[in-house]
């Protein structure tokens, strides 16, 4: 232990190991696969790739399953929470993520994670950044990520907004 100190690391898969079971759960009518706890671990684990992994699994099942998974990751949770998002339509929040299907197919999630130093927290963090899978990100109608490069305004000006409970129809007295 003295020789390794904080460089000692090991890998353990403690859930979702069986691909068949995981696929069944991702597509089960009583699950909401777009929700994960990736934002809960900012100081140690920051994978944020649960949705990309779900799309990759769907892709292995065929194009129809990709369409179903996009629906399950976007429109379905928006409807569940009663918010005007999750669809590309007039008046909806215009946040889009453009994914390269060839890069997604080639991506091996177990080989793209690495450590970065988080000066804000004074520690290292494990991140999973799949190069070239996410081609573009558009928030509030503004391009913020284009082929691996943040826009000049990213982090300096607001692009979109957080959807809060007050946006729910119940909170607005509409239900």
Residue ranges and their predicted role:
Residues 1-175:
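Active-site microenvironment of metallo-dependent hydrolases
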